[in-house]
Amino acid sequence: IEMNCRGSNIIERVFRDVNPTPYISLFIDGCMEKGRDVMAGGAVLYEGLGTIFAGLATYADSMAAVRRLVYEDKKYTLPELITALDADFDGYDDIRRDCLQAAKYGNDCDEADFIARDIIDYTEQKMNSYPSLYARHIHGTLSQSFNTPLGAMIGATPDGRKAGKPLSDGMSPSQGMDKKGPTAIIKSVSKLNVESMSLGMAHNFKLLPRFLETAEGQHAVISLLKTASLLGNGQMQFNCVDNETLRAAQQHPGQYRDLIVRV
């Protein structure tokens, strides 16, 4: 985190000196009054540069598995688990099965959900402790699509994820790990402190198209949104497309020009 903040300060200096934004500055309170570009600290409220993080659920699920299997149940030693990870679980099917069966964020399970909450709070507090040129450093949990290339560079993880596979995206559960339905997902997300994600957050929610083909399904989605709002969830965005459509779009992109997928 410290290295990231130092790098951001260098970027701020470069932006200030070689990349002013006079047009944007016209619409930012304080810039006209001070006669300073927003990149040079002209804004009345200036948060500074932010950092977006990927792999929240991957981290939470991994730490939950380590705590349960190594420290609480003492089923494996830490060196044994590391050996299995280094081997990408090849020859360690039993260890991987136990890792996959450990608590997972997104199932309204405090064991994993509170780890996700704690790492978000810690990250924001730690970043706030490093000054930027004009304010403070902040972070957000909205991985956009870089959770996939990052995952390609990272080995196996204690949540049971194999080497090279995508990390989890945004505030969403790890792929395929939400087992208890949409209500459990939003209850897990509601435990996160949205005020600790000053740069923003993204919760990608996947729905099958047939779910919205009936009035009952449509009302269920409306109820889900209302419940999420009441629980204090900061953000939700929906993908409503099936795998067959996505594969067809890859093969024949010209036929699917109106297809929009949130990432």
Q: Where are each of the predicted segments found?
A:
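Acidic, glycine-enriched catalytic cores built around paired aspartates
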Residues: 1-263
